[in-house]
């Protein structure tokens, strides 16, 4: 008899689940026995490939296009998930954007878009998830934060601010939802080699050399933290941030 996975039979929804860390998390959850809704926004082929990979692992999956900044779109996303899977055990708020620009070159639209994707998106998705999870009297919400929410980075003002806000959101939401059996935590990765960060190759190499582990992280380096926070093993974790960052910061 095959050994049950840590997430056997659970139903997960991962925003931005078609690429990068989100895709790796969706696949890791499937490998541990979960069925997954892959929410995507820009590339249907990536989403379809992720779904196919999950199905190849013996789990069920659907891909749903969603704009996490839109209340109507988020409502439709969660309706699609519920119609297919009936319940929601795990939400991963991973959808995000990143842009490097100096303060004087940052438009109000740039600023508001960054905050909308990271903060409004997490708010809308968490609110929708909480409705389902309260009925079940249990659930897990995992927010994808960033070490830049702690230390900032020049020319990443909007992104660093959004991620700092998401850290505060994670802690406050954890205190609100814990009495309902819903555990909210976050993962704050360091620089991960996914192509998401606009740093040059030379800058990434220099950054890697500065780390105690002397290399950038990979999506696979991130997934154990996400599996842990979605599993029963994290039953006493509430409002906590895990830091897979190669030792760059040690909060």
Where do the model's predicted regions map?
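Short C-terminal tail/terminal secondary-structure segment
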Residues: 1-3, 151, 227, 238-251
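Conserved glycine-rich cofactor-binding loop
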Residues: 18-19
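Short, small/polar-rich loop/turn modules that mediate ligand/substrate recognition or access, typified
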Residues: 87, 178, 183, 237-239, ...
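Substrate-binding pocket helix/loop in short-chain dehydrogenase/reductase
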Residues: 102-103, 110-115, 207
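Active-site helix of classical SDR
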Residues: 126, 162, 170
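Alpha-helical segment proximal to the catalytic Tyr-Lys
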Residues: 131, 175-176, 235
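Residue(s) in the substrate-gating loop at a strand-loop-helix junction
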Residues: 146
